[in-house]
């Protein structure tokens, strides 16, 4: 498993000085015009390619199994909801800084960045860089977002994003010149670069030239009023917010820096994203990227995605596919002209159980806060049987922790309380005072109720119910009855947030391959959506306005460690903090992981090149396909 990212590092290189990317002056390289744009250039509707690129573009060197490509083609993919067009900002993965497959942070949209004491960040933009409509991309776009959006009480009533605050305080933002801007905090902000490299980043810039027309401080009041009425919104701020969503990519008029731009106004069942003529990357032969002219996203019913993929109706597909579809997909390869790659999932656990330590029921709250109970429930699960039954034994069996791909992986954390041992589980439950049993052999709570755990599921993964039924069978051996309640994601989460759900099932942490420089907030009670402690997370996120203060020693230690990490500017110290937090999770079993590295089917057309056969399917870090740069994928016209 450790070799997957290493493979990617030699074959799918990311952006920046530390990779095989190099930057050269535009006048030193003969750039090639994408054929689809030549008529617009000839007609004078579009500048020539050398005028569209930054003065210092990003030159992409393709090595290993990758090769420079040719222009042309439209890539087809399927989405289950129209709002999933946001994946184009994920897959495009044009970021100020981005992760390499070896998990280094390097420049992308930025020419360079300087860091002092982990609290002073100077960002250098590429001179001559342009938005997709040809307008200059400069520090004015950063100033506008900070002063007129993030710090505007009408547009941002809660103030700037939490990621921009350190100990509740914002940075000093200094515009040095058109291509240089500096952010200075009084204390370290080790998450600043990471937050800009995520699948869903904090976009700290906006196309000011476009959005100012909707802003009360810049636009014409009569024009804004007319636009508010036409859009059927309540105010200029509502209009501005609707027009401004860099992540969702649902406004075709909003300029972008991604490799493809939306040309379809919602609602629609088919969305076309065409090439960005001002995209900043170029291959070694002088071809401006992307190679592919357009990406077509078709909305399809989720249950039909496997069949449509099997029929060859998509060129690149992962969404809507599960491991259970792999056999059928492999069977259609020859007939429909595609390959099925299997990438391990990058989450800390594919399936995980979340006992709610904040549940309202005082008896259950006391039960779940006893580490012996959580450990017993973990040891009462036959992970090997689940792996064989659902994943042909190909997944990794262990607890909720980082995967072997991570430099922070420790086998002891992965294995602790993760082996199937009904005898030990029974002993732990007895020691926890749950030794009384009813006539049917089920354990009784202290008030005489049967120990029946209702596990709530969103039912989005077809294998989830199968997994829970297998858990139910082995828990019965330790005197615990598991009942399954299926609802929707929102209903399940809201019941957990309100303290009504006893236990929920979800995946583990999105980032199962973390390094010490990545924010460990998800390991501490900082978020409501960590379903083991939603009310503690609420308390942190609302500064004590709602939820409950942490009142469990081990959880309090996690919070203290998180604060230490945030204040540290020393890598080794951060590593020690991460390892201690992971150790606490393994010992306490706050989240009961089952299996990880489940293989994700990736359907790839035989005509499509530069998609790595071996990869890691990770939301953060990785942006799923994003880290492998679809702008470098290309179609072979001879196939």
Q: Across the structure, where does each feature detected by a protein language model lie?
A:
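Surface-exposed binding/hinge segments that line
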Residues: 162-240
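Short, well-ordered beta-strand elements
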Residues: 72-81, 120-124, 142-145, 181-183, ...
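Extracellular/periplasmic solute-recognition and catalytic clefts
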Residues: 149, 153-159, 173-174, 261-274, ...
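N-terminal lobe/hinge region of extracytoplasmic solute-binding protein
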Residues: 39-117, 147
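Ligand-site clamp/hinge motif
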Residues: 126, 247-251, 278-330, 375, ...
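A structural "hinge/loop" feature
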Residues: 63-90, 109, 192-201, 364-366, ...
């Amino acid at each position: 498993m450790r070799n997957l990212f290493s493979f990617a590092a030699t074959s799918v290189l990311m952006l920046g000085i530390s990779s095989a990317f190099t930057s050269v002056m535009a006048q030193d390289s003969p750039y090639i015009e994408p054929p689809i744009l030549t008529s617009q250039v000839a007609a004078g509707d579009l500048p020539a390619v050398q005028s569209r690129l930054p003065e210092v573009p990003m030159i992409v060197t393709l090595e290993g199994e990758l090769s420079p490509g040719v222009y042309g083609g439209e890539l087809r993919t399927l989405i289950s909801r129209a709002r999933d067009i946001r994946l184009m900002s994920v897959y495009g993965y044009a970021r100020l800084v981005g992760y390499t497959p070896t998990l280094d942070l390097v420049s992308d949209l930025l020419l360079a960045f300087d860091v002092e004491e982990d609290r002073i960040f100077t960002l250098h933009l590429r001179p001559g860089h342009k938005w997709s409509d040809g307008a200059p991309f400069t520090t004015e776009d950063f100033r506008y977002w900070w002063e007129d959006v993030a710090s505007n009480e009408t547009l941002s009533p809660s103030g700037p994003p939490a990621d921009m605050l350190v100990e509740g305080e914002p940075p000093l933002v200094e515009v040095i010149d058109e291509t240089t801007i500096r952010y200075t905090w009084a204390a370290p902000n080790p998450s600043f670069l990471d937050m800009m490299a995520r699948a869903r980043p904090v976009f700290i810039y906006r196309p000011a030239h476009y959005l100012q027309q909707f802003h009360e401080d810049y636009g014409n009041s009569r024009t804004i009023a007319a636009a508010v009425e036409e859009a059927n919104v309540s105010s200029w701020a509502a209009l501005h917010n609707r027009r401004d969503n860099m992540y969702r990519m649902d406004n075709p008029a909003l300029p972008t820096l991604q490799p493809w731009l939306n040309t379809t106004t919602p609602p629609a069942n088919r969305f076309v994203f065409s090439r960005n003529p001002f995209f900043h990357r170029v291959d070694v032969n002088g071809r401006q990227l992307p190679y592919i002219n357009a990406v077509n996203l078709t909305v399809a019913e989720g249950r039909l995605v496997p069949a449509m993929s099997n029929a060859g109706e998509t060129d690149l597909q992962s969404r809507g596919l599960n491991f259970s579809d792999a056999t059928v997909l492999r069977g259609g390869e020859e007939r429909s002209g595609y390959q099925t790659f299997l990438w391990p999932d990058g989450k800390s656990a594919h399936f995980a159980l979340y006992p709610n330590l904040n549940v309202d029921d005082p008896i259950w709250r006391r039960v779940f806060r006893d580490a012996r109970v959580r450990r017993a429930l973990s040891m009462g699960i036959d992970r090997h049987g689940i792996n064989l039954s659902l994943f042909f034994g190909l997944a990794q069996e262990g607890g909720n922790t980082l995967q072997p791909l991570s430099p922070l992986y420790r086998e002891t954390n992965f294995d602790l309380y993760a082996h199937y041992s009904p005898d030990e589980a029974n002993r732990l439950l007895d020691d926890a005072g749950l030794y009384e049993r009813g006539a049917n052999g089920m354990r009784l709570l202290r008030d005489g109720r049967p120990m029946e755990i209702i596990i709530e599921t969103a039912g989005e993964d077809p294998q989830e119910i199968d997994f829970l039924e297998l858990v139910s069978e082995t828990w019965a051996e330790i005197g615990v009855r598991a009942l399954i309640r299926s609802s929707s994601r929102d209903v399940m989460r809201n019941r957990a947030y309100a303290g009504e759900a006893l236990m929920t099932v979800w995946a583990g942490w999105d980032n199962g391959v973390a390094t010490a420089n990545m924010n460990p907030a998800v390991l501490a009670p900082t978020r409501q959506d960590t379903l083991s402690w939603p009310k503690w997370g609420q308390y942190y996120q609302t500064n004590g306005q709602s939820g409950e203060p942490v009142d469990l020693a081990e959880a309090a230690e996690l919070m203290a460690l998180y604060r230490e990490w945030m204040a540290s500017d020393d890598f080794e110290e951060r590593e020690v903090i991460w390892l201690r937090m992971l150790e606490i999770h393994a010992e306490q079993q706050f989240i009961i992981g089952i299996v990880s590295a489940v293989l994700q089917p990736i359907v790839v057309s035989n005509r499509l090149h530069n998609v790595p056969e071996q990869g890691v399917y990770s939301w953060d870090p990785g942006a799923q396909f994003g880290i492998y740069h679809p702008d470098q994928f290309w179609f072979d016209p001879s196939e």
